[in-house]
């Protein structure tokens, strides 16, 4: 059975935890393992933080959009902003690369997403924003809820 959720919120750093918990609560109905749920929560945190810090450069008037689609044991996440986009996507996806060293950012966001998810697609256009499509196939072990 397919189920879908859409969420939008202001690009404020305090909304990162709201996004993470909301997505986790929605995904819980698939009964993921604790490890799977933790990985998805981490990926949501990374993507939302990137949108707020890099996409909107701290402009709270921006909006972050999240879509979650559940199908059987598959989770599809789309996290989108309408910020400044990514100038050099290949460079941005390199471990430890950051455009904000003064904020003590580690530059591991995309690396974490790629390691925790089964599929990662990043589409970015300068001045039009960034969309990240993430897919995770769950083990379907009935670990948390049953």
Swiss-Prot record:
InterPro entries (UniProt xref): Anti-sigma-factor_SerPK (IPR050267), Anti-sigma_F (IPR010194), HATPase_C_sf (IPR036890)
Keyword list, A-Z: ATP-binding, Kinase, Nucleotide-binding, Serine/threonine-protein kinase, Sporulation, Transferase
EC class of the enzyme, as a word: transferase
Biological process per Gene Ontology, one example term: asexual sporulation
UniProt GO MF annotations: ATP binding; protein serine kinase activity; protein serine/threonine kinase activity; sigma factor antagonist activity
Enzyme Commission code(s) on record: 2.7.11.1
Membrane-traversing stretches: none
Catalyses which reaction(s): L-seryl-[protein] + ATP = O-phospho-L-seryl-[protein] + ADP + H(+); L-threonyl-[protein] + ATP = O-phospho-L-threonyl-[protein] + ADP + H(+)
Entry function: Binds to sigma F and blocks its ability to form an RNA polymerase holoenzyme (E-sigma F). Phosphorylates SpoIIAA on a serine residue. This phosphorylation may enable SpoIIAA to act as an anti-anti-sigma factor that counteracts SpoIIAB and thus releases sigma F from inhibition.
HAMAP family: Anti_sigma_F (MF_00637)
NCBIfam families registered for this protein in UniProt: spIIAB (TIGR01925)
Homology family: Belongs to the anti-sigma-factor family.
Protein name in UniProt: Anti-sigma F factor
Native species: Bacillus anthracis
């Amino acid at each position: 059975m397919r189920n879908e959720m859409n969420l939008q919120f202001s690009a404020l750093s305090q909304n990162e935890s709201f996004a993470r918990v909301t997505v986790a609560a929605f995904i819980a109905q698939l009964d993921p393992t604790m490890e799977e749920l933790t990985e998805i929560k981490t990926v949501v945190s990374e993507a939302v933080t990137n949108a707020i810090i890099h996409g909107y450069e701290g402009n709270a008037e921006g909006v972050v959009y999240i879509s979650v689609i559940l199908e059987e044991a598959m989770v599809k996440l789309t996290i989108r902003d309408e910020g400044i986009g990514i100038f050099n996507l290949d460079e941005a996806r390199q471990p430890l690369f950051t455009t904000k060293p003064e904020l003590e950012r580690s530059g591991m966001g995309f690396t974490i997403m790629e390691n925790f998810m089964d599929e990662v697609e990043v589409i970015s256009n300068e001045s039009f924003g960034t969309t990240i499509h993430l897919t995770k196939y769950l083990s379907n072990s009935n670990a948390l809820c049953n």
